Every structure is written in C-alpha cells, then in structure tokens.
A protein has these predicted regions:
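Disulfide-rich, cysteine-dense extracellular ectodomains and adjacent flexible linkers of secreted
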Residues: 1-245
C-alpha cells in the first residue's frame, strides 16, 4: 500500500549493542554491551545477548563486537572467571610461583619455583624470577616464597654452591674438623681439632667431638683424624699429647 512503512525499514542494532525496548528511534537507543562483554551478531534485543570474555581475558571498553576485542591477562597473572573488565581483574601468581604464558584462566596455570629456589614477589612471569637459595642453605620443596624458607645446613656441614635443593647437598666437614653453627657456606668454616686431639668421623658439630689422644699416642698437627703411636723406645703418659716429649 502506498505510504505504508515496512518493518524492513527498521535497522538492526549493530554488533556490540542491543535494544530492549520497542520503538527505538536512533542508533543511540541501542545500548553498548558492558565492559567485559561483546556480541558479534546484529539486532540484539537483550543484555544477555552480550557474551562475557572467556576466563583469562578482559575488555575494558563498552560496545565490543568480537571475541578478539578481549585481551589476554599478561604472563604472571590469571583470571578464573568470565567477563573480566579490566587488567586489574587479572590476579598475580602467588609468591613462589610464576607463569610464562598469557591468557591464563586458573591459579593452577602458575608454576611453583623448583626446589632450591624461591620468589618473594607476586605476578612473576618467568622462571628466572625464581631466586637461588644462598650458599649454606637449601630448600627441598617447590613453590617457596621467601629466603626464610631456605634451611640452614646443619652444624658440621656446609654447601658452597647456591640453589641447593636437598639436605644431602650439604657436605660433611672432613675428619679432624668440626663446625658448631648451621648455615656454613665453605669448607674453610670447618675448624681444625687442636694438636693432641682428633676426630675420626666426618660431619662433627662440636669442639667436644675432638678427643684427646690416648696415652701412648700423640698428634703434633691440628686437624688430625687419628693419633700416632709413640715410636719404639718412647712413651707418652698423658692423654692429649701434642709432642713426643
């Protein structure tokens, strides 16, 4: 009929928008999808037509019209819900963990620092952010979050390298020597038993582990692992003799 208005004269709201009410007269009546959401189709008539960005992604501008508008959370961060609306919605990997990939959608995507290392900061994004335990210490579990989680080598032991991952990495002081504190980082921390005393075991932790040479034996050198018998024709009455006199 001449002068009639056809429904085809009504224009779809464009992608990224929707209109709930009938009788919309302008494009501005079409409402933009909220931040964190998008819609690819045109002619949308309810807010639910807008789709939340997938977990691990966000969009901070309204009216997005394609999934590609959603931005990956950066490496070192994750987002475990849909519809992220800002980079700040992405959660940093916990201290002791890192993630080298972007778009992570779960805390489980964060990887624990290996044993022997730790990371104090949140949001670490590469394995190199994990720091070696210092010499003299070790940590035997993954995911450590502080230097304080690195354990001292026990008294009587030391380790000179960094990044030790087990108590067995700590090395015994040699026979004839001891060390009475933990956390030693060099064999030079091991102390010689004085002349006239010895210790035959490795890993001694006390000065009292050094035992005086028995009567008939002596030791003229410090750091002895054993005492020497007096030669034929000579004797030593006292224990702990350091000379042949």
């Amino acid at each position: 009929m001449i002068g009639s208005v056809s429904a085809v004269s009504c224009i779809d709201c464009e992608a990224g928008r929707y209109a709930i009410d009938t009788g919309s007269a302008t494009l501005e009546d079409c409402i933009e999808c909220a931040v964190g959401r998008y819609v690819v189709a045109t002619g949308n008539d309810e807010a639910e037509d807008c789709i939340g960005c997938a977990a691990g992604r966000y969009v901070s501008e309204p009216g997005s019209d394609e999934a590609e508008d959603c931005i990956d959370c950066v490496a070192g961060r994750y987002l475990d819900v849909e519809g992220g609306s800002a980079a700040s919605d992405c959660i940093g990997c916990a201290a002791g963990q890192y993630s080298e990939t972007s778009g992570n959608d779960a805390a489980d995507d964060c990887i624990g620092c290996v044993a022997g290392k730790y990371a104090e900061a949140e949001g670490s994004n590469e394995a190199s952010d994990c720091i070696d335990c210092v010499a003299g210490r070790y940590v035997d579990v993954a995911g450590s979050a502080a230097l304080s989680e690195c354990k001292d080598c026990a008294a009587g032991k030391y380790v000179a390298v960094v990044g030790s991952s087990a108590a067995s990495d700590c090395i015994d002081c040699a026979a004839g020597r001891y060390i009475d504190v933990g956390g030693s980082d060099s064999d030079t921390d091991c102390i010689d038993c004085v002349a006239g005393k010895f210790v035959e075991d490795t890993g001694s932790a006390l000065e009292s582990d050094c035992t005086g040479c028995a009567a008939g034996k002596y030791s003229t050198m410090s750091g002895s692992a054993a005492c020497i018998d007096c030669e034929a024709g000579r004797y030593a009455i006292d224990t702990g003799s350091a000379t042949l006199e």
